Swiss-Prot record:
Keyword annotations from UniProtKB, A to Z: Lyase, Plasmid
Gene: xacD
SUPFAM superfamilies named in the record: Enolase C-terminal domain-like, Enolase N-terminal domain-like
InterPro entries reported for this sequence: DgoD-like, Enolase-like_C_sf, Enolase-like_N, Enolase_C-like, Mandel_Rmase/mucon_lact_enz_CS, Mandelate_racemase_C, Mandelate_racemase_N_dom, Xylonate_dehydratase_2
Pfam families in alphabetical order: MR_MLE_C, MR_MLE_N
Protein name: D-xylonate dehydratase
Organism: Haloferax volcanii (strain ATCC 29605 / DSM 3757 / JCM 8879 / NBRC 14742 / NCIMB 2012 / VKM B-1768 / DS2)
Induction per the UniProt record: Transcriptionally up-regulated by both L-arabinose and D-xylose via the pentose-specific regulator XacR.
């Protein structure tokens, strides 16, 4: 058997027989921090504009990683359920641990839904741990950096979301005062003309009202910003086609989720019926689900939500698949700074990143959850060079904004 050290010695003598798989000793302990073990996994929920689920992974190397699962109930219990599958494992084996959790939870819904969201939060925290152990930013763990900053689009709301003029005024304000050059408004708002919203059919006056919103915003903003509009899976295929057709003259950035997310055949028909770009993806899980949108080119823009779809590496894989069809990625995001930065790290590392969503511009303390300042400036996120995600959780701020009944991480 040839030892590893002998293979590295230019003066060592050995035969080709010595190099056979049966005779080479390939044992090479990683050593040092690379032999770290996971000791604990904890969660807490923060009462933001959504109930954000923060995840902490602890190691015997003294390094703690922070992640975020997609908001809502259930994930914390699932993460607690998965903790025994992680304790004692090496946190650097991110891809193996991801598949390990999927397999372990295969009888409990690991193909999609809350289990994948919970795994996503753990996976993000593992990237934070790995970056800190290896002293590299998280983007280096998913391919390296294409850009130093990521374009951010701001999801906007007004007190009267059905008022076209109110939407136009808010769009102008955010562009002029906050510096964004990309914004989004909702179109699934009441028009006052509905007869039966349950059937998802849009009557002509309803479509006219939505066109009025689009016209008011795009004319007010002009060339200063790209403007997208979100439908939240609200309409029939026929209604979606008619609406998209009516918007073709307004050069909208994209129309998002016009039909329910389950039937990708209908989604393809809508997309191929119009020159209005169609964006879909936040309600579709893992690379397997996204593939059924990308391969038939049922979308013009893919919009996965990283803390929901499977985490950082899964989003990178989705972006690679999208790139095969020349489809850009505009990540959906309603997260705290943790999930947002995880998304930004991946957006920096993929060639086809279009923009990243920001959904908390009206929440004054969003940035207080971390010690770093000025995360978003003039509609862009600069990617930090610090190890891991590059953010430090402010535990005092987390405690101040926890969901009632939650407890803070036990850092002892």
């Amino acid at each position: 058997m040839v030892e590893q050290a002998k293979l590295s010695d230019p003066n060592a003598e050995y035969t080709m027989r010595d190099l056979s798989a049966e005779t080479i000793d390939i044992t090479n302990p990683r050593g040092g921090v690379r032999d770290a073990e996971i000791t604990d996994v904890q969660t807490t929920m923060v009462d933001g504009n959504y109930p954000w689920i923060l995840v902490r992974v602890y190691t015997d190397a003294g390094v703690v990683g922070t992640g975020e699962a997609y908001w809502g109930g259930g994930d914390t219990a699932i993460i607690e359920r998965m903790k025994p599958f992680l304790v004692g494992e090496n946190p650097l084996d991110i891809d193996r641990l991801y598949e390990h959790l999927v397999q372990k939870m295969s009888g409990e819904g690991s193909v999609s839904g809350k289990v994948i969201s919970a795994i996503s939060g753990i996976e993000i925290a593992l990237h934070d741990v790995a970056g800190k152990l290896l002293d590299v930013p998280a983007y280096q763990l998913v391919g390296g950096k294409y850009r130093d900053e990521v374009r951010v689009y701001c999801d906007l709301h007004t007190e009267d979301e059905a008022n076209p003029q109110a939407c136009a005024e808010e769009g102008v304000r955010v562009v002029e005062e906050l510096g964004y050059d990309a914004i989004k408004f909702d179109l699934d708002v009441p028009s006052g003309h509905e007869k039966d919203r349950a059937n998802r059919h849009l009557r002509n006056p309803e479509i006219d009202h939505k066109v009025e919103i689009v016209e008011a915003v795009t004319e007010a903003v002009g060339d200063r910003a790209d403007v997208a509009f979100d439908c939240h899976w609200s309409f029939t295929g026929g209604s979606a086609k008619r609406l998209a057709s009516e918007l073709e003259d307004y050069d909208v950035w994209w129309l998002e989720d016009p039909v329910p997310p389950e039937n990708h055949d209908v989604q393809k028909l809508v997309t191929q019926s119009t020159t209005t770009p169609i964006a879909v993806g936040e309600n579709v899980y893992r690379k397997f689900g996204q593939r059924t949108l990308l391969e038939p080119q049922a979308v013009d823009i893919i919009a996965p939500d990283l803390p929901r779809v499977g985490g950082m590496r899964e989003t990178r894989k989705i972006a690679d698949l999208a790139d095969m069809y020349y489809i850009p990625v505009a990540m959906h995001n309603v997260s705290s700074p943790i999930g947002t930065m995880a998304s930004a790290q991946v957006a920096a590392a993929i060639p086809n990143s279009l923009a990243l969503e920001y959904h908390s511009y009206q929440l004054g303390w969003w940035e207080d959850l971390v010690e770093e300042d000025d995360l978003i400036q003039n509609g862009h996120m600069e990617i930090p060079e610090k190890p891991g995600l590059g953010l430090t959780l402010d535990l005092d701020a987390v405690e101040a904004h926890m969901v009632e009944g939650e407890t803070l991480f036990d850092e002892e």
